[in-house]
């Protein structure tokens, strides 16, 4: 920004710009000037880099050149989308004064601030992902979350009691923008959140102010009706969030009318590592489009259904009553034959959830209302389709009741909006002919201008005897009568010269001037009238807005249920039995994603876990299918807890509170953590937080360090989980020493993935069998990976020597392989003490034994 030089003052326009910019120092200020939004100084330089637009200059002000960049006003949305995707906040500064009446710069003011978490425009949003604004506050050990989807009006709060739980919630919510107090922002520096973190002064999180602000928004005396009176930390976060959106959006929010309380104990907790390893929305290779669970499951007909399905996946429920209602709904839809009619009807609904939010914010465009009109017209047909199903599903009945219809609003939109309106209301031609008599009259006046001008031209030609006379119009001079310079002497006395050209003269007459004033006034008045009618039309949505939102929610849920039913039929999924007894039983289970990517048939496998069989030690070759088997178990459990059918012949799923996975690892270079450090951090999280109701998947624990260290750690982790935590655990390993654990640890069982060797080539059978694997097939897998044959031959020779040497040392007493399960050898002093009978020793004998023990201790120290 320029320094103010009192000797060289800024121009009035730049003074206005700098005054407004000073109020928004951390945003890009788009300053409206005619048909462009201009950026100056540092903003111009940054916008030029981010948008790849030309950086120019606009003269000088206060003696300094003014860097400038600009974007056309009609292309604003496309540029905003690029800026928001890069995490920028943008202040839109519009001309609100009348240029004709302004002596100095036209009056301007910021009408809205667009931030990553407050976007509502369709062009700026990903259709199938929620765009969330979150606020996080910490008081003592309690973390309070508030989460707002401004595009739908959903406003949720949640409290958790640990940093690990807060991290898990942050991974689930995945906000586009996160508001935190300035002191808490320091804690989040090392977090892996992709959100734009917005540090705010502590007073934004003042509890009393938050309480007042929330009650004012909801029109209530207190917050008791929302069940959150005691959630002080979350309320502080919610107040901050509401203050922020009011400050940036500068409008009312009638679609935000309630707080919904979420409780972590009602859902299965998935930590960030688990969400990543299960590849719910993004594969481990970073591809978000393919080879993910959502890619297999999401065949929804609407964008709002797709967003709801993602919320299901990221927050699997523990409430068996609700899950069984969803299962019953799927069964009812399947029994009804899954007609394509319902799918087609849903596809015609569009994204009315987000359209309603734009209506509430008064930013809905004409084509939004056309789409909403179409959706309202389809509601009776959707209801009819549901009525044809049997009445066993209470959930489908409830959804059907929420679908309206809304005949009065539908009829109003049919009368009010033309068939194919322009994009913007300011372009005119949105309100249908016949809806408003005053508008029709103004349109008639301006619309018949052509006929009047044709008649005027013909009449003036006859009057002046000038056959080449013509009537024209331009934006600068308005309407005119034009004759050639050679015929100018024939112009009647009432012709008033308006413009002189090289070969022609242009004139105005009192009659033409009167017509011009009337027509231009009619056009302006018609646009103003149309805008007023449009605002009145949006107002008609306000009273039924809660019911319309319930309708949109019901359509989204119906879309998800219909989609899951179709997936179950197409992919041959079955309804899992949800049990109150701990354990998991899966017959012929399949990995939902892997089976869709294979050319060969997927090999299904069984799994049994129960009170007496709580841990499976899984061995077998690399690429044998251990990780697939483990992941498919977790995914089947997760699908069961969103109410979906599952890829298996039969499944019985007991209570689960958390799913943990530690599968694979990579260096965290940015965080300065090695592969082994990442592995141990994830393992520590499991050991601290797993319970007897948790499903734990551990793959190759200890492989990132030396053999003995890794084996020792793996053995200790298995023992702790089996003896202390008693979680349902799948533990894959190449440490064959661990296969002896079932002999001494109750509830631990060996499984292995089968493979066979044919002419020094390995064949993976991918079948799970009881018992430990017989060998690891490491060299065969290396050959399969393309390791040169001479390297494989040398490795095979080295392996034979190592095995022979180990065997020879063992039989010669040269040191057997470390046996972690053998009890530690007793110190000689222990044996002496065990043989003593203190009651039979004389004082002298006792003193001699004491010296003997001291001697043994000294000997041990010197060695």
Swiss-Prot record:
The keyword tRNA processing does not apply. The keyword Ubl conjugation does not apply. GO terms for cellular component: cytosol. It comes from the Bacteria. GO terms for biological process: mismatch repair. InterPro entries: DNA_mismatch_repair_MutS (IPR005748), DNA_mismatch_repair_MutS-lik_N (IPR007695), DNA_mismatch_repair_MutS/MSH (IPR017261), DNA_mismatch_repair_MutS_C (IPR000432), DNA_mismatch_repair_MutS_clamp (IPR007861), DNA_mismatch_repair_MutS_core (IPR007696), DNA_mismatch_repair_MutS_N (IPR016151), DNA_mismatch_repair_MutS_sf (IPR036187). SMART domains: MUTSac, MUTSd. ATP binds at residues 620-627. NCBIfam families: mutS1, PRK05399.1. Belongs to the DNA mismatch repair MutS family. This is DNA mismatch repair protein MutS. It comes from Nitrosococcus oceani (strain ATCC 19707 / BCRC 17464 / JCM 30415 / NCIMB 11848 / C-107).
């Amino acid at each position: 920004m320029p320094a103010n030089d009192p000797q060289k003052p800024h121009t009035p326009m730049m003074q206005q710009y700098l005054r407004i910019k000073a109020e928004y120092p951390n945003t890009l200020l788009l300053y409206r000037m005619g048909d462009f939004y201009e950026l100056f100084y540092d903003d111009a330089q940054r916008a030029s880099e981010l948008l790849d637009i030309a950086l120019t200059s606009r003269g000088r002000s206060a003696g300094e050149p003014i860097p400038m960049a600009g974007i056309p006003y009609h292309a604003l949305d496309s540029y905003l989308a690029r800026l928001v995707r890069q995490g920028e906040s943008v202040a839109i500064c519009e001309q609100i004064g009348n240029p004709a009446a302004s002596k100095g710069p036209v009056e301007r003011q910021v009408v809205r601030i667009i931030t990553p978490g407050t976007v509502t425009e369709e062009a700026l949003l990903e259709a199938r992902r929620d765009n969330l604004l979150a606020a996080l506050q910490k008081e003592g050990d309690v973390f309070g979350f508030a989460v707002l989807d401004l595009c739908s009006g959903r406003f949720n709060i949640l409290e958790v009691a640990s940093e690990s739980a807060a991290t898990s919630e942050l991974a689930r919510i995945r906000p586009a923008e996160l508001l935190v107090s300035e002191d808490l922002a320091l804690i989040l520096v090392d977090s892996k959140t992709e959100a734009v973190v917005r540090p705010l002064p502590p007073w934004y999180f003042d509890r009393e102010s938050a309480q007042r602000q929330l009650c004012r928004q909801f029109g209530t005396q207190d917050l008791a009706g929302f069940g959150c009176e005691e959630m002080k930390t979350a309320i502080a976060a919610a107040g901050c969030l509401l203050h922020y959106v009011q400050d940036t959006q500068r409008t009312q929010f009638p679609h935000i009318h309630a707080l919904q309380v979420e409780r972590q104990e009602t859902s299965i907790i998935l930590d960030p590592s688990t969400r990543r390893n299960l590849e719910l929305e993004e594969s481990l290779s970073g591809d978000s489009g393919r080879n993910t669970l959502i890619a297999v499951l999401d065949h929804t007909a609407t964008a709002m259904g797709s967003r709801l399905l993602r919320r299901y996946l990221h927050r699997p429920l523990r409430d068996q009553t609700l899950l069984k209602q969803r299962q019953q709904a799927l069964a009812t839809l399947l029994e009804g034959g899954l007609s394509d009619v319902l799918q087609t009807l849903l596809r015609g609904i569009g994204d009315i959830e987000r359209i309603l939010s734009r209506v509430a914010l008064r930013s809905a465009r004409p084509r939004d209302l056309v789409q909403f009109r179409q959706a309202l017209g389809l509601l009776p047909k959707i209801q009819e389709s549901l009525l044809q199903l049997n009445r066993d599903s209470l959930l489908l009945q409830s959804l059907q009741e929420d679908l309206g219809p809304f005949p009065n609003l539908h009829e109003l939109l049919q009368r009010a909006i033309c068939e194919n309106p322009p994009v913007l209301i300011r372009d005119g031609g949105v309100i249908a002919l016949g809806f408003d008599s005053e508008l029709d009259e103004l349109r008639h006046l301006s619309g018949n201008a052509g006929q009047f001008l044709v008649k005027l031209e013909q009449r003036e030609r006859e009057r002046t005897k000038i056959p080449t006379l013509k009537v024209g119009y331009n934006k600068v001079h308005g309407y005119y009568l034009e004759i050639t310079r050679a015929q100018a002497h024939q112009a009647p006395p009432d012709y008033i010269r308006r413009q002189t050209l090289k070969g022609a003269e242009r004139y105005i007459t009192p009659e033409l001037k009167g017509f011009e004033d009337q027509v231009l006034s009619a056009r302006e008045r018609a646009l103003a009238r149309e805008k007023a009618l449009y605002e009145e039309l949006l107002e008609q949505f306000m009273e039924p807005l809660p019911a319309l939102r319930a309708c949109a929610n019901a359509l989204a849920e119906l879309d998800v249920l219909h989609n899951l039913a179709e997936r179950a039929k197409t992919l041959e999924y079955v309804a899992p039995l949800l049990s109150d007894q701990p354990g998991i039983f899966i017959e012929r289970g399949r990995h939902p994603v892997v089976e869709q990517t294979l050319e060969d048939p997927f090999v299904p496998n069984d799994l049994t876990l129960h009170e007496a069989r709580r841990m499976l030690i899984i061995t077998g070759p690399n690429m044998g299918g251990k990780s697939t088997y483990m992941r498919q178990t977790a995914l089947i459990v997760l699908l069961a807890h969103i109410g979906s059918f599952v890829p298996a012949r039969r499944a019985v799923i007991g209570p689960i509170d958390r799913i943990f996975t530690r599968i694979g690892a990579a260096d965290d270079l940015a965080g300065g953590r090695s592969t082994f450090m990442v592995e141990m951090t994830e393992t520590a999280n499991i050991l601290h937080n797993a319970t007897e109701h948790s499903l734990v998947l551990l793959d190759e624990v200890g492989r990132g360090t030396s053999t003995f260290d890794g084996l020792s750690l793996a053995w200790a982790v298995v023992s702790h989980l089996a003896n202390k935590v008693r979680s349902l655990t799948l533990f894959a390993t190449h440490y064959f020493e661990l296969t002896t654990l079932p002999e001494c640890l109750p509830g631990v069982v060996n499984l292995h993935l089968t493979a066979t060797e044919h002419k020094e080539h390995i064949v993976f059978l991918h079948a799970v069998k009881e018992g430990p694997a017989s060998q690891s097939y490491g060299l065969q897998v290396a050959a399969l990976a393309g390791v040169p044959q001479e390297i494989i031959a040398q490795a095979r020779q080295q392996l034979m020597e190592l095995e022979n040497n180990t065997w020879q040392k063992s039989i010669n007493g040269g040191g057997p392989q470390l046996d972690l399960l053998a009890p530690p050898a007793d110190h000689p002093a222990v044996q002496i003490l065990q043989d003593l009978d203190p009651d039979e020793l004389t004082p002298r004998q006792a003193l001699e034994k004491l010296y003997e023990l001291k001697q043994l201790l000294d000997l041990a120290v010197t060695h």
